[in-house]
């Protein structure tokens, strides 16, 4: 089920991109881009969707738009994808804003936020609350345009050996977070 929903979402997104970027494929010359990835294609959902996205764009454009997916490290290290796109050494990147925090401190707000809003609330903020516009303004300072291609639900961040009853119980506790932990 999850795989079918993901494929449908990627198909719709890719269709929109093809019409915006390519238009009439027969009247266009071929565009070939390199897309560096921060995720290996064998990683469920976020990794496997990169090559699917590339292939769908190629098919729907009749080959006029060919974005070649590169595994992490093939063009640049995984955490350097954003910088490679900003500098022009790759035309596209398959990454997450959470990996851009060193360059853009606000970037994690455009990805999964630990203990943050649920998926519906987050998508509403992006679309109706100015989230996309804010992201576009921030990324434009680096010459990059971000497109939200996939949504990962917020991290619950917690299977613990003992019950958490107060903030004091969190002191010294180690928890994994993808981009940054709340202060």
For the regions a protein language model found, what residue spans apply to each?
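Boundary at the C-terminal end of the N-terminal hydrophobic targeting segment
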Residues: 25-29
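N-terminal secretory signal peptides that target proteins for export/translocation
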Residues: 1-6
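Bacterial N-terminal signal peptides
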Residues: 9-20
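Extracytoplasmic "Venus flytrap"
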Residues: 34-50, 72-76
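Short, polar/charged alpha-helical segment
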Residues: 42-68, 183
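Short, hydrophobic alpha-helical packing/hinge segments within bilobed ligand-binding/sensory domains
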Residues: 78-82
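Short beta-strand-to-loop elements that line the ligand-binding cleft
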Residues: 67-76, 175-177
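Contiguous mixed-secondary-structure segments that line small-molecule binding/active-site clefts
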Residues: 54-55, 86, 91, 96-183
């Amino acid at each position: 089920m999850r795989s079918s929903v993901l494929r449908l979402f990627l198909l719709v997104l890719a269709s929109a991109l093809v019409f915006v970027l390519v238009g009439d494929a027969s009247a266009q010359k071929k565009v070939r881009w390199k897309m560096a990835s921060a995720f290996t294609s064998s990683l469920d959902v976020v990794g496997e969707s990169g090559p699917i996205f590339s292939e769908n764009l190629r098919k729907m454009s009749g080959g006029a738009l060919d974005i070649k997916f590169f595994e992490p490290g093939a063009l640049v290290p995984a955490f350097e994808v954003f910088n490679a796109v900003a500098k022009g050494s790759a035309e596209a990147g398959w990454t997450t804003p959470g990996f851009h925090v060193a360059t853009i401190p606000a970037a994690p707000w455009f990805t999964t936020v630990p203990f943050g809003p649920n998926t519906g609330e987050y998508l509403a903020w992006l679309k109706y609350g100015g989230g996309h516009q804010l992201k576009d303004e921030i990324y434009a300072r680096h010459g990059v345009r971000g497109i939200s291609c996939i949504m990962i639900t917020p991290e619950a961040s917690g299977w613990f050996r003992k019950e958490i009853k107060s903030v004091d119980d969190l002191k010294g506790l180690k928890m994994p977070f993808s981009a940054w932990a709340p202060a």
